[in-house]
Regions:
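Sequence signature of WD/YWTD-type beta-propeller architectures
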Residues: 6-13, 19-20, 27-398
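Short alpha-helical interface segments
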Residues: 1-5
């Protein structure tokens, strides 16, 4: 589907970061930003009924769901793939450069970024139906390069963490974005299930510590760090809520040669190590299964020569124990782990897709072929898809 939303900015660009192999699109200069802002509310009000009509309203935001399509960005467009047939389709194919698609937690909508043609560091945020139809621009003013774009559990708003460390809440119904807090970084899927009443984050001025706050930015509280734990605990990677919102998983750096996965209760109590594997290991990026009974994570093992070697993704019961290797080992930098909505498989992409740097037309960026790993038998299936961004797996009603 072609994105056709009028704006005043010319569509020419040198593109960098976030996605790969973007191509610029040139179109005429049309009315100035003042006019766009004046007409913004009218545009959203007119488009919102069509967008809302696409909501199923039956898919829970957390827990197991039926598998839908997988979305990603490449060449400045948004693609979707069917994990059963392997077929791919262009969902949003211009004009302009679009990137970083994220399905809403109820699976009915898709959020994505559109680069401002005259300023490669700024983006408009759009929301469409899951099939790419009825796209609506939900930001009247472009935002600086986002570090995170996340849906709230009710699928009615987006949390945007910009490059300056500010968090804004943008309603998809057209109200102005509201500043929640600044100088912070959201954790992946930061909203606490089931209602998003709290947010997980890190502070710019307190590296290695983990915090939680109310969704409006009030009542900040340290969960990991000197003020919260009687240990020299240092957060060493992303932290994530369990699907029921009762626990948090994350990696802690124990020393220069060991990083392990830990779990604690949502209130910060009961901190304990998840895995019991012996030897020198680095474990990172723990990701909960939708069922909440298992956790998958990247891991590296130090060999006899003292070098760190990537190992297959590890899976361990949420109650703790020995990590079982699953599938083929990812690339040396580790995998982006995305559980299927039904919890029966894992989508693995190399982390280089989030580190790509492209300047059109000479840049090559980082393009990956996704691997889907069956949890039951460990079978790994590589799809012949060219993926240039983090992927998003759509949830559908059971």
């Amino acid at each position: 589907m072609t994105l056709d939303i009028d704006e005043e900015r010319t569509r020419s660009a040198i593109v960098e970061d976030l996605d790969v192999a973007m191509r610029p699109v040139v179109s005429p200069l049309i009315p100035v930003r003042v006019v766009v802002v004046a007409l913004f509310v009218v545009m959203v009000v007119a488009a919102t009924p069509a967008l809302l009509s696409h909501r199923s309203g039956t898919t829970p935001p957390f827990g197991p769901a039926r598998n839908g399509r997988i979305a990603w960005a490449i060449d400045g467009d948004i693609m979707v793939g069917d994990p059963i047939t392997g077929a791919t389709t262009a969902l949003i194919d211009g004009p302009g450069i679009v990137r970083n698609p994220v399905y809403s937690l109820d699976g009915s909508r898709l959020a994505f970024l559109r680069q401002v043609p005259t300023d490669q560091s700024r983006f408009d945020i759009f929301v469409s139906a899951a099939d790419g139809g009825s796209p609506v621009m939900v930001t009247a003013v472009p935002v600086p390069m986002p570090a995170a774009l996340e849906w709230t559990p009710d699928s009615n708003a987006l949390l945007v963490n910009d490059a300056d460390g500010r968090i804004f809440r943008h309603s998809i119904h057209g109200s102005a974005g509201r500043l929640v807090v600044d100088a912070v970084h959201l954790e992946p899927s930061a909203s606490r299930p089931p209602d998003g009443a709290e947010l997980l984050y890190e502070r710019d001025g307190d590296p290695g510590a983990l915090y939680v706050m109310a969704r409006d930015g009030s009542r900040p509280r340290q969960l990991i760090g000197p003020a919260a734990q009687q240990c020299s605990c240092t957060l060493a990677g992303p932290a994530r809520w369990s699907p029921d919102g009762k626990a948090i998983a994350f990696a802690i750096r124990l020393d220069a040669a060991e990083t392990r996965t830990f779990v604690m209760a949502a209130d910060g109590s009961g901190l304990h190590r998840l895995t019991d594997d012996t030897g020198a290991w680095i474990e990172n990026d723990p990701t909960w299964a939708p069922t909440g009974d298992r956790i998958a994570f990247d891991r590296w093992q130090r060999d006899d020569a003292g070098d760190w070697q990537i190992r297959p993704i590890g899976i361990v019961p949420a109650s703790g124990g020995h990590a079982e290797p699953i599938g083929v080992a990812p690339a040396a930098e580790g995998a982006l782990i995305e559980w299927s909505p039904d919890g029966r498989s894992i989508l693995s992409l190399p982390k280089t897709v989030i580190d790509g740097y492209t300047t059109y037309p000479n840049g090559t960026g980082s393009v990956a072929k996704p691997v889907i790993i069956d949890i039951d038998d460990g079978a790994s299936t590589q799809f012949d898809w060219s993926v240039g961004s983090v992927a998003s797996w759509q949830r559908r009603a059971p």
